[in-house]
Amino acid sequence: MPLLDSFTVDHTRMEAPAVRVAKTMHTPSGDAITVFDLRFCVPNKEVMPEKGIHTLEHLFAGFMRDHLNGNGVEIIDISPMGCRTGFYMSLIGTPEETRVADAWKAAMADVLKVKEQNQIPELNVYQCGTYHMHSLEEAQEIARHILDRDVRVNSNEELALPKETLKELHI
């Protein structure tokens, strides 16, 4: 099985909250696609609650588009990580990490402005696979966590696992 890019970085040295360019690739027509690791929690030390991350998934996708789309950038998808420590965001374009961090903070401020659970987009049996598994309160706690700690940039060079370590792990 091929080694995925996300497993070539040392999760024990990752800071959070932080932005990291996880991957950059080009389509056959030459468009740049960038995948960002938006790390909300320190790996193996913190985790987002399932209802909160699910609600955040519904809110974050729209709010990030409001603040980041334009000037050569268009978000394709924002999806939560299975480990519940962050989200992956795929987009067309190559925005600077600081631009992504600013949009992320603005999106978190927007999450805090949502007043009631019924304002969560697509919160119904037709558009959500687990529509009863939501918590606006938990999503807002996550947003406060980000805004209270600010957003840094994680560098791939600083986080790269040495080849010897990968060999020891039989990868």
From Swiss-Prot:
Catalytic class of the enzyme: lyase
Superkingdom per UniProt: Bacteria
Molecular function as annotated in GO: iron ion binding; S-ribosylhomocysteine lyase activity
GO terms under biological process: quorum sensing
Disulfide bonds: none
Entry cofactors: Fe cation
Cofactor note: Binds 1 Fe cation per subunit.
Signal peptide positions (record): none
Keywords of the record: Autoinducer synthesis, Iron, Lyase, Metal-binding, Quorum sensing
Annotated binding of Fe cation, by residue: 54, 58, 128
InterPro entries, sorted: LuxS_sf (IPR037005), Metalloenz_LuxS/M16 (IPR011249), S-ribosylhomocysteinase (IPR003815)
Catalysed reactions listed for this entry: S-(5-deoxy-D-ribos-5-yl)-L-homocysteine = (S)-4,5-dihydroxypentane-2,3-dione + L-homocysteine
EC code: 4.4.1.21
Function statement: Involved in the synthesis of autoinducer 2 (AI-2) which is secreted by bacteria and is used to communicate both the cell density and the metabolic potential of the environment. The regulation of gene expression in response to changes in cell density is called quorum sensing. Catalyzes the transformation of S-ribosylhomocysteine (RHC) to homocysteine (HC) and 4,5-dihydroxy-2,3-pentadione (DPD).
Similarity annotation: Belongs to the LuxS family.
PANTHER family: S-RIBOSYLHOMOCYSTEINE LYASE (PTHR35799:SF1)
Binding partners and assembly: Homodimer.
HAMAP family xrefs: LuxS (MF_00091)
NCBIfam families: PRK02260.1-2
Entry protein name: S-ribosylhomocysteine lyase
The organism's taxonomic lineage, starting at the top: Bacteria, Pseudomonadati, Pseudomonadota, Gammaproteobacteria, Enterobacterales
Gene: luxS
